[in-house]
């Protein structure tokens, strides 16, 4: 370890101990040196004994900075890793940190724009940030070319080395988990960290976020349900992103929405429809839809429209996963647990040798209590959560896109019920899912598939005569080969029959000669000639078998 890594490790240990997180170390022989070592650090007492363990963990992660905050947020979606009281606290982690100097942001913008001063591209650039988070911060300005108000998102300077150093330490901790916890290997901690690393590195590339926002905006162009601000891609780079400034009511400000006369029932239902439209129609969904990233337009409160920002994290599902997911939801709410278990095996989410009966029983045991509630009170997100947690006990592979989907669904559901507590998510989603599944089979699906494949067949059409000729020629050669093999097999069969016949005669002569030699000595040389003849015939038959 480098001196810098040692200092950082010391700071992390000191922070964990000051919040009493040594309680998380399991009491076993392997951890005895760790526990004894903790007692030797008597000058680092637990300074927060009045707080519960989950809250202490959350505060410690916030103190450690952006990498650990985001790691905690991601872990909050993996409720198979922690008890509910800890997972609930991790879900409260806020990605808000002190802003960095606006002059540094200005220098980064000028570097990204080829060294020209900010004033060459923007008017009214505000040196004070509008918002600040762990990875980037946002400044307001006005485009010089057309006078439109924009926000400029800038990556924090020197954030990458900090992230890389902390990730190394997190990887080291992850490698210890299978040794410290009896169930540690099944939890695949290294895969969890690898998944987190990919998400974090993606967030550092603002060109990727720009592309995501452009795609989402195109998907919901002219939609009354969702508006994505325009991205000015000519001004975007890996460290800087420029997009339209929006004005809206934060979705968490229920009082302001009600004051504006917003149709809260329609707004809540539209949130559900937006989510399922992204997942099943577009196969491309905003995977960071927490309340801080969602606003509601001031205009047309009777026909409310969401505004989505911060498209750094997105997810996608392939056709097979979408179909299995939709069928899983419908089977779940029909309480067809056998179907759910079979779908998991068919999809490859769990190993093919999984015992379907045992899996069905495990799902039933976990989920039946949920369905004792009225459907309107059942959490779609928690159903999915229980399903995945149960499947992981049967060695379900970590599916990053499904984890993102589960997290997003929990956000959507939480926001929807905050806006309209009577929201029946299943009643809103079921017609959409049934319509989508119906659209995937029958004549409409066949017509769509033919339409999708038409360009391919048009391109291949001129090659078809040649392909047919080649196939016929290969078929002719194949027939010759088959005939040749058949003849050889026939010859071999005849040869084998002859050899078996000769071996039988040889053995008979040999046995007859032996019998006569013992019982009829008066026959003279005859038994001997029979035995010699038997050996000769047997040898001839044996040679034919080779």
UniProtKB/Swiss-Prot annotation:
The chain crosses the membrane at residues 501-521, 522-542. The keyword Membrane applies. Its main location: membrane. One of its GO terms (molecular function) is ATP binding. GO terms for biological process: regulation of ubiquinone biosynthetic process; ubiquinone biosynthetic process. It is a multi-pass membrane protein. Pathway: Cofactor biosynthesis; ubiquinone biosynthesis [regulation]. Residues 124-502 form the Protein kinase domain. HAMAP family: UbiB. This is Probable protein kinase UbiB. It comes from Salmonella typhimurium (strain LT2 / SGSC1412 / ATCC 700720). The lineage of its organism: Bacteria, Pseudomonadati, Pseudomonadota, Gammaproteobacteria, Enterobacterales. The gene is ubiB.
């Amino acid at each position: 370890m480098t001196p810098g890594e040692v200092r950082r490790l010391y700071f992390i240990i000191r922070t964990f101990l000051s919040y009493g997180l040594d309680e998380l170390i399991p009491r076993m022989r392997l951890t005895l040196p760790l526990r004894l070592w903790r007692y030797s650090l008597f000058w680092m007492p637990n300074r927060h004994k009045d707080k519960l363990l989950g809250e202490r963990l959350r505060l410690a992660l916030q103190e450690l900075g952006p990498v650990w905050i985001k790691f905690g947020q991601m872990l909050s979606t993996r409720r198979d890793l922690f008890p509910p009281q800890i997972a609930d606290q991790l879900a409260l982690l806020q990605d808000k940190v002190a802003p960095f100097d606006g002059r540094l942001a200005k220098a980064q913008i000028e570097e990204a724009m080829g060294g020209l001063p900010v004033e060459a591209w923007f008017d009214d650039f505000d040196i004070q940030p509008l918002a600040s988070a762990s990875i980037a911060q946002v400044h307001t300005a006005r485009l010089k070319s057309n006078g439109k108000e924009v926000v400029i998102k800038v990556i924090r300077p020197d954030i990458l080395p900090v992230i890389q150093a902390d990730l190394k330490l997190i990887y080291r901790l992850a490698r210890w988990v299978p040794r410290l916890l009896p169930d540690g290997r099944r939890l695949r901690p290294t895969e969890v960290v690898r998944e987190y690393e990919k998400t974090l590195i993606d967030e550092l590339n603002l060109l990727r976020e720009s592309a995501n926002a452009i795609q989402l905006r195109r998907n919901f162009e002219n939609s009354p349900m969702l508006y994505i601000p325009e991205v000015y891609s000519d001004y975007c780079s890996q460290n800087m992103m420029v997009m339209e400034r929006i004005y809206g009511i934060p979705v968490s400000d229920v009082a302001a929405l009600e004051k504006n006369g917003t149709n809260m029932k329609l707004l809540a239902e539209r949130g559900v429809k937006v989510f399922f439209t992204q997942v099943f129609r577009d196969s491309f969904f905003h995977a960071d839809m927490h309340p801080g990233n969602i606003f509601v337009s001031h205009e047309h409160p009777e026909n409310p429209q969401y505004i989505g920002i911060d498209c750094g994290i997105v997810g996608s599902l392939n056709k097979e996963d979408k179909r299995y997911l939709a069928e899983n939801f419908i089977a779940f709410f029909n309480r067809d647990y056998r179907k759910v278990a079979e779908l998991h095996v068919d999809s490859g989410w769990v190993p093919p040798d999984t015992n379907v009966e045992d899996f069905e029983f495990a799902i039933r045991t976990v989920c039946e209590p949920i369905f004792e509630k009225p459907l309107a009170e059942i959490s779609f997100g928690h159903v999915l959560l229980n399903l995945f947690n149960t499947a992981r006990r049967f060695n379900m592979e970590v599916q990053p896109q499904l984890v993102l989907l589960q997290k997003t669904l929990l956000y959507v559901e939480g926001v929807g019920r905050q806006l309209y507590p009577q929201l029946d998510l299943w009643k809103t989603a079921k017609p959409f899912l049934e319509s989508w599944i119906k659209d995937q089979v029958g004549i409409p699906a066949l017509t769509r598939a033919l339409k999708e494949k038409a360009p391919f067949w048009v391109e291949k059409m001129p090659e078809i005569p040649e392909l047919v000729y080649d196939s016929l020629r290969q078929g002719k050669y194949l027939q010759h080969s088959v005939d040749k093999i058949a003849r050889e097999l026939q010859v071999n069969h005849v040869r084998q029959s002859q050899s078996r016949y000769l071996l039988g005669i040889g053995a008979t002569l040999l046995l007859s000669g032996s019998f006569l030699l013992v019982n009829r000595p008066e026959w003279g040389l005859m038994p001997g000639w029979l035995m010699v003849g038997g050996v000769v015939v047997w040898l001839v038959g044996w040679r034919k078998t080779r």
